[in-house]
Design a protein with these regions (language model features):
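Glycine-rich phosphate-binding loop and adjacent beta-alpha segment
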Residues: 203, 235-301, 337
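C-terminal hydrophobic helical "lid"/dimerization subdomain
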Residues: 1-4, 240-243, 289-337
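Mid-domain Rossmann-like dinucleotide-binding core that forms the NAD(H)/NADP(H) cofactor-binding site
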Residues: 87, 127-210, 215
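Cysteine-cluster motifs in flexible loop/terminal segments that predominantly coordinate metals
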Residues: 91-120
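Glycine-rich beta-strand-centered segment in the early N-terminal region that forms part
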Residues: 22-38, 52-94, 126-129
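Residue-level marker of beta-strand positions
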Residues: 67-69, 86-87, 114, 159, ...
Length: 337
């Protein structure tokens, strides 16, 4: 039996270990992908600390990693749309019997030398896009894309705000710029993140502790407020602040994960202004991923600055710790088997 290395999370004990496991074999309709790059995401941190739980996992241990790119090593019976050697980026999840299963959460992901996938749950990766940049698109980019284009349905010239300009938020700024949002307001307590937001295309970057934040948002929006606000931080105080600068009929989209209660201090004002709170998770992979790959290939979006470091698979725990502690203010760390 052939084996491989994989970073496995034992969910009950929250223990992450790099182990030698059997190399999977592709069944009918499946392909085996030799992993070239796998992103490390805050969702992985949340899985390890217990904030995020795998509700559909069979068993108690899972190979992490939902941001994965590589080359096809083998194809299973009946697969005609993929060929060995083809460069691909995997969807962050698969639809099974009408239910979406998340890769690296509900079934084994890509923190491994090889990853198994349905042949339909991937997209060709153009030669012009490096594996590391391609790997992060299925979550770090497509999640903001879905939040902006689908959940909030942002239109050109609408004012938008992004709270938390980290691994997803900085890409939200880029996507908002691409879809024509104007102005774009970035909010983050970290001065490095604020500078990063301005470089990504934000019109103004503010500290949430600034007592003049509401006045600054009013000034940049001509007194109208934000048509759409995005919480990528998952912090209750962020939501209160974002609602306070929403325009009438404005949308607050919750992207950052938290187990804290959702509270609106002034419910009467919220209802009177016909504002909305919308939850968001993931994206429509078959629709979003090809579009994003085209935008990157055409130079409309550029994620070369999003790769903050690359580590070998054996140092997966170190990568998680660096992201959790925000050492060096990383956007995305990449594991390479």
């Amino acid at each position: 039996m052939e084996t491989m290395l994989a970073a496995r999370l034992h969910v009950p004990s929250r223990t992450l270990r790099v182990e030698e496991v059997p190399r999977p074999q592709p069944g009918p309709g499946e392909v085996l992908v030799k992993v070239e790059a796998a992103g490390v995401c805050l969702s992985d941190v949340h899985l390890i600390d217990g904030t995020l739980k795998p509700f559909l996992l069979r068993g108690d241990t899972v190979t992490l990693g939902h941001e994965v790119s590589g080359t096809i090593a083998e194809v299973g019976e009946g697969v005609t749309i993929r060929t060995p050697g083809q460069r691909v980026v995997l969807y962050a999840g698969e639809l099974r019997d009408g239910v979406t299963y998340t890769r690296g959460v509900d079934y084994d992901g890509g923190w491994a030398e090889y990853a198994l996938s349905a042949a339909t749950a991937m997209a060709p990766l153009p030669d012009s896009i490096p594996f590391d940049q391609g790997a992060i698109i299925p979550d770090a980019v497509s999640t903001p894309w879905g939040a902006i284009t689908e959940t909030a349905a942002v239109r050109p010239a609408e004012a938008a705000g992004v709270w938390g300009v980290g691994g997803l938020g900085v890409h939200a700024v880029q996507v908002l710029r691409a879809v024509g949002a104007c102005p774009i307001v970035a909010v983050d307590p970290n001065p490095v993140a604020r500078e990063r937001a301005l470089a990504a295309g934000a019109d103004i970057a503010l500290d949430p502790a600034d007592p003049g934040l509401r006045e600054a948002v009013a000034a940049v929006t001509g007194g109208a407020g934000l048509a759409a606000a995005f919480d990528f931080a998952g912090v209750p105080a962020v939501r209160e602040q974002a609602v306070s600068v929403l325009a009438p009929k404005g949308r607050l989209v919750l992207v950052g994960l938290t187990d804290q209660p959702l509270t609106l201090t002034d419910g009467t004002r919220f209802s009177y202004l016909q504002q909305r709170v919308l939850g968001h998770y993931g994206s429509d992979m078959p629709v979003a991923l090809p579009k994003l790959l085209r935008l990157v290939q055409a130079g409309r979006l550029d994620f070369s600055g999003s790769i903050s470091g690359t580590l070998p698979l054996g140092r997966a725990a170190e990568a998680v710790a660096r992201l959790e502690k925000k050492e060096g203010d990383p956007i995305r760390l990449i594991l390479r088997p």
